[in-house]
Swiss-Prot record:
Its main location: membrane. The lineage of its organism: Bacteria, Pseudomonadati, Pseudomonadota, Betaproteobacteria, Burkholderiales. The complex is composed of two ATP-binding proteins (HmuV), two transmembrane proteins (HmuU) and a solute-binding protein (HmuT). The keyword Iron-sulfur does not apply. This is Hemin import ATP-binding protein HmuV. GO terms for cellular component: plasma membrane. Part of the ABC transporter complex HmuTUV involved in hemin import. Responsible for energy coupling to the transport system. It is an enzyme of class 7 (translocase). Belongs to the ABC transporter superfamily. Heme (hemin) importer (TC 3.A.1.14.5) family. ATP binds at G35, A36, N37, G38, A39, G40, K41, S42. GO terms for molecular function: ATP binding; ATP hydrolysis activity. It comes from the Bacteria. CDD domains: ABC_Iron-Siderophores_B12_Hemin (cd03214).
């Protein structure tokens, strides 16, 4: 069962944000969404998550139009990590991660506690479990929010039912080690747990290293879509980012690329 955007067009205040964009997120794949600032990446992610209604076009989860699903139905099938999660309450870290279980009221407290423990461990933030969320650094908060969406994805996972995870710039506040850990976890969720994962990143080389498929947006349109070798070309770098770049085979990772701006 795929999550599929078909010919999406979306505008805000009369200004076009997306124009005729189609994209499929399939189980078992990690898709990277790239593009310059203002290209429409976050808008496309929000539309795929069912949070924004397109002016034309549809988003389908299998055969179901996303517009026909209510908020709880959506939350039980997909989890979203926004670019800037807002949380104004003085909650403990475990309470924040436990919010991932909110769409699943049938879970008993013991099951929720285990879900939280597992998510904290998978996100490598177990050592923060007793801290207060507002007292954390920006990077620590980002990792705790990642644990929250992991809990949401793993809750009440029925065999054969695909879950989708959407991450909007999840590594923007992270140091290099934690960037790699988060993206490695995202890829494992796709390849080993069979999830469909969409991630927005600005680091082209991180996208080249971890993603199976890349979608390159330019001015609200899909400029390129495919494996990294097809998308990360000097011509695309010039047209989309306005930079001259060399694209080389990665010296230590077979089948992966390095993009070096001149």
């Amino acid at each position: 069962m795929t999550l599929q955007a078909r010919n999406l067009t979306l505008a805000r205040g009369g200004a076009p944000i997306l124009t005729d964009v189609s994209l499929t997120l399939a189980p078992g794949t990690l898709v990277g969404l790239l593009g310059a600032n203002g290209a429409g990446k976050s808008t496309l992610l929000a539309a795929l998550a069912g949070e924004l209604a397109p002016r034309s076009g549809q988003v389908y989860l299998g055969d179901a139009d996303l517009a026909t699903l209510n908020a709880r139905q959506l939350a039980r099938r997909r989890a979203v990590l926004p670019q800037k999660p807002s949380l104004s309450f003085d909650l403990g870290v475990s309470d924040v991660v436990g919010m991932g279980a909110y769409p699943f009221p049938e879970l008993d407290p013991a099951a929720v506690r285990q879900l939280v423990r597992d998510a904290l461990e998978q996100a490598s933030v177990t050592h923060l479990a007793q801290r207060r969320y507002p007292q954390l650094s920006g990077g620590e908060q980002q990792r705790v929010q990642f644990a929250r969406v992991l809990a949401q994805c793993h809750a009440m996972h029925a065999p054969g039912q695909t879950r989708y995870l959407m991450l909007d710039e999840p590594i923007s506040n992270l140091d290099p080690r934690h960037q790699m850990e988060l993206l490695a976890t995202a890829r494992a969720l796709a390849h080993e747990a069979g999830m469909g994962v969409l991630v927005i990143v600005h680091d082209i080389n991180q996208a080249a290293r971890w993603c199976d498929t890349l979608a390159l947006l330019a001015d609200g349109r899909l400029a390129a879509l495919g494996p990294p070798a097809d998308v990360l070309t000097p011509d695309h770098m010039r047209r989309v980012y306005g930079i001259e770049a060399d694209v080389l085979a990665h010296p230590t990772l077979p089948g992966r690329l390095l993009v070096l701006a001149r």
